[in-house]
Amino acid sequence: MKAKSLLLALAGLACTFSATAQEATTQNKAGMHTAFQRDKASDHWFIDIAGGAGMALSGWNNDVDFVDRLSIVPTFGIGKWHEPYFGTRLQFTGFDIYGFPQGSKERNHNYFGNAHLDFMFDLTNYFGVYRPNRVFHIIPWAGIGFGYKFHSENANGEKVGSKDDMTGTVNVGLMLKFRLSRVVDFNIEGQAFAGKMNFIGTKRGKADFPVMATAGLTFNLGKTEWTEIVPMDYALVNDLNNQINSLRGQVEELSRRPVSCPECPEPTQPTVTRVVVDNVVYFRINSAKIDRNQEINVYNTAEYAKTNNAPIKVVGYADEKTGTAAYNMKLSERRAKAVAKMLEKYGVSADRITIEWKGSSEQIYEENAWNRIVVMTAAE
């Protein structure tokens, strides 16, 4: 019976390693100090569609009223977030930028297109704690691209100036993103680029400087949330290793004992020995959900209780450094009842289960995180 108890305890301890990773508190660190899991290549993609107004800042255009210089500019982009705070995007911008010749308020049309690869930096996710349901994000970006002016026309529709002008561009911008749902965001974006497309109205300067302000929607594709990589609590791992090694030594010692029994002494009044087997279920912080890697502890205890017709006492706890005493009492109650429910699932009759909860009023271990537990005691 002692060997069975030791093996049961050894199996329970061997299943607690993955639970230790869930006890760390790195979820409260800024994104720059947090590592995230690599997801599938198809995850974290997005498409943005927007429209707004644009104008050219350079040359004689500045002599014309602000409103008269505004033209309609659509944008379309496709991109991917490689981290919660870093992404890349290929955006297409173009249509018409108005230009004004020297001394004239006659509106000329510069028909152009601009494709640019942007490097996006989410300041909110970088300097703040990552939250998948955060409503507001500030995202500056910079990029390089290719610009092409098809041709220019005057107010009468006659082609003027040069055509088929190609140039490299330097692009910068700022996006303000508002979360509407898991898959849709609303964006307000301002951007500008520098390139030499020979727009009408630029005085034949060294570069054209169009600016644009747009509003639109982003559609998120695939998985949108990020999962943190939580480091292991190595102090707890070492302690569990020591306990496992100690139990292995005891099992090895028992296995070396001779099978044959010595001569029995004269019969005496038998002494009843009460065998008590404890097992533990570890929980994540602020959670009463039993992780899959902890279910084996509940299963082993249930099997032991059924085999030995033993009652089970279930006691829930919470750590004292998280939450109030009243909240921890409720949390420990939910944990204890969750374990009792799973014991019933594995075949233990409800009338053989006693449930108690201590909240954070009693701390079994000096290590704070180790007290997020339910202790199961099966006694013959």
From Swiss-Prot:
Disulfide bond residue pairs: none
SUPFAM superfamilies to which the protein is assigned, alphabetical: OmpA-like
InterPro entries: Bact_OuterMem_StrucFunc, OmpA-like, OMPA-like_CS, OmpA-like_sf
Alphabetical list of PROSITE patterns matching this protein: OMPA_1, OMPA_2
Signal peptide: 1-21
Compartments (UniProt record): Cell outer membrane
Self-association and partners: Disulfide-linked heterodimer with Omp41.
PANTHER family: LIPOPROTEIN YIAD-RELATED (PTHR30329:SF21), STATOR ELEMENT OF FLAGELLAR MOTOR COMPLEX (PTHR30329)
Annotated positions of the Pyrrolidone carboxylic acid modification: 22
Annotated membrane topology: Multi-pass membrane protein
Function in brief: May have porin activity and function in peptidoglycan binding.
Entry similarity comment: Belongs to the outer membrane OOP (TC 1.B.6) superfamily.
Organism lineage string: Bacteria, Pseudomonadati, Bacteroidota, Bacteroidia, Bacteroidales
Predominant location category: membrane
Record's protein name: Outer membrane protein 40
